[in-house]
Amino acid sequence: MKRELDPVLYLGLDVATKRDTCALVAITPDDNFESYIHWGHVIWQPPVDLVTQVLPVLLELFTNQRIAGLWYDPYQAITLAQTLKAKGHGYKLLEVNQQTQMTQAANTLHSLLTENRLTLIPDDEVRAHLSWASAKQTERGWRIIKLVQTKPIDFTVALAMAIMGATQEHGHGTYPAWSSNKHVRSPFVLDSIAA
């Protein structure tokens, strides 16, 4: 699959600060929104400081990439959302209700995985987060749960939110004027920002 030079990114953010990891996932669709590519991710180990660790990465992405939206759990991310809104990115922030919409997100992720329409970056930490997650069938559909309570699954949850956003939203990516001195074009940009 060819990689776009200037992709539209759909972000999913699963926030935790004290005892659990925090994960940000970026995916991009193909031209027809039939397949999706895992463009990059950051997983922060606890304790996580949202203002000094997560916010700079989000601001860097919103400034230098075409971001269609950020799907996130509003319960833990109030400060992040307020700061991003103050910086003019409020229209790209989409709250995900953890009771109702996460079932939809899990169902969408399940469909893409079983239909082999999602390409993931080979990464041991990603593999671990996915292996520690399980899908539980409920009357509303699939729900993402932890197999072992002490193992993190935040990447899986963030991926599900990003996938849900990408499969629902089309044509919302905006982008400031491009400058080769200012903008980065690399699928590994998240690694360099998070370091």
Feature locations, PLM:
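RNase H-like, metal-dependent nuclease domains and their acidic two-metal-ion catalytic environment used
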Residues: 1-96, 103, 107, 120-195
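Short, surface-exposed amphipathic charged segments that create phosphate/polyanion-binding patches used
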Residues: 105-115
